[in-house]
Amino acid sequence: MSGGKLPEGWATSTINEMCNLNPKLKLDDDLDVGFMPMAGVPTTYLGKCNFETKKWSEVKKGFTQFQNDDVIFAKITPCFENGKAVVIKEFPNGYGAGSTEYYVLRSINGLINPHWLFALVKTKDFLTNGALNMSGSVGHKRVTKEFLENYGVPVPPLAEQKVIAEKLDTLLAQVDSTKARLEQIPQILKRFRQSVIVAAVNGQLTKELHKKNKFKLTELNISIPSLWKISEIGQFADVKGGKRLPKGESLIAENTGFPYIRAGQLKNGTVLPEGQLYLEEYIQKSISRYTVSSGDLYITIVGACIGDAGIIPDVYNNANLTENAAKICNLNENIFNRFLSLWLRSSYLQDIINSEIKSGAQGKLALARIKSLPLILPPLQEQHEIVRRVEQLFAYADTIEKQVNNALTRVNSLTQSILAKAFRGELTAQWRAENPELISGENSAAALLEKIKAERAASGGKKTSRKKA
């Protein structure tokens, strides 16, 4: 870990000098222990282990061994880069085993705080440099033992390690809490947008325009203004299908000027341009009748997202449409396409579509059924006013969502920023000033490293005794 001037009382060392790497255990075969596969190791800083209880005889061979207060982390890609690491806590009888793709770091006689050591392996510096020092084939690269053993570390005194670990737990819990709250907002905004659409198509969004007119309950069990009408989509527009590629033909990434709209692009009321593919000219000529015009509406008719609807934007004028969707075109002069899009996307119509798909045998929305789908129809002038109000409210929601995403980006970088401050000594500067006796003399990091060295020398050559519950 690179760094400038060390804080007072700190010293430099390596992981190999500070702790034991992948030490072995000798336990009674009938001892209950925890077994934790890679999936049980969290990626978040404050995540918990997920393990099951097994007999030691079942897991003592062919797995990595560890005990309470060991720090374990994944050494294989992409688990290493994803930050799979944890301090072992509350395992049955204090012992466990798991994937052979773990590295285990064990403090020597408690002279290194395991939670501080865990913070070290979660830093960006450790993860970045570890990823650059992998060996093996693609998809099976692993952090090398040489990198791990020789990784340089700025070491605080033991008392300060504890303070750093506690501060990190507190600060990063606050980060997680903030992140969790921010991550809830997009779902709240999604519900808000749907509630706006519902209010738009049942007259509540413009109810002040109907002070003199009563609302009526329709056969759709929706209360709407008495001046509004109920009809069918086919009475006000044509419904036509898209077209699959001719047999043996395929799409290409090169922009030929003939875009092909696939079902996966039909989202959020529009056509998403990401991953756009194209037709070669000779193929397009053979299916040229199955194009869309800007302002047409689309609705998906098969697949997991059946019923997704929206408007074809200008940039997709004359594009070909997938056979997995239909277009609604040639609209009557009494219907505004943007209002029809709101109706198609409303929970009222989506519930009708979903109910029929679930009860039907084909799992497909037939063109004839689209024509017969109900349509709530306000006066044309009010349709335009409804759309204006909806778009205004959606713009507010979009602004909030953008601010939330920017805040999430900042929050996501906070963890590494805080960890970097911790290993520069910035989180504990005041503590050091208030506790000089805990960072100097025999309490200094230099003295601590000498103790570790002495303990290691004293324990060298001694066999590990068999442990019992």
Curated annotation (Swiss-Prot):
CDD domains to which the protein is assigned, alphabetical: RMtype1_S_EcoEI-TRD1-CR1_like, RMtype1_S_EcoJA65PI-TRD1-CR1_like
Cystine residue pairs: none
InterPro entries associated with the record: Restrct_endonuc_typeI_TRD, Restrct_endonuc_typeI_TRD_sf, Type-I_RE_S_subunit
MF (Gene Ontology): DNA binding
Keywords associated with the record: DNA-binding, Restriction system
SUPFAM superfamilies for this protein: DNA methylase specificity domain
A Gene Ontology BP annotation from the UniProt entry: DNA restriction-modification system
Summary of subunit composition and partner proteins: The type I restriction/modification system is composed of three polypeptides R, M and S; the restriction enzyme has stoichiometry R(2)M(2)S(1) while the methyltransferase is M(2)S(1).
Role, per record: The specificity (S) subunit of a type I restriction enzyme; this subunit dictates DNA sequence specificity. The M and S subunits together form a methyltransferase (MTase) that methylates two adenine residues of the sequence 5'-GAGN(6)GTRC-3'. In the presence of the R subunit the complex can also act as an endonuclease, binding to the same target sequence but cutting the DNA some distance from this site. Whether the DNA is cut or modified depends on the methylation state of the target sequence. When the target site is unmodified, the DNA is cut.
Miscellaneous comment as given in the Swiss-Prot or TrEMBL entry: Type I restriction and modification enzymes are complex, multifunctional systems which require ATP, S-adenosyl methionine and Mg(2+) as cofactors and, in addition to their endonucleolytic and methylase activities, are potent DNA-dependent ATPases.
Domain observations: Contains two DNA recognition domains, each specifying recognition of one of the two defined components of the target sequence. The recognition domains can be exchanged between different S proteins, generating enzymes that have new sequence specificities.
Similarity field: Belongs to the type-I restriction system S methylase family.
Name of the protein in its database record: Type I restriction enzyme StySJI specificity subunit
Lineage: Bacteria, Pseudomonadati, Pseudomonadota, Gammaproteobacteria, Enterobacterales
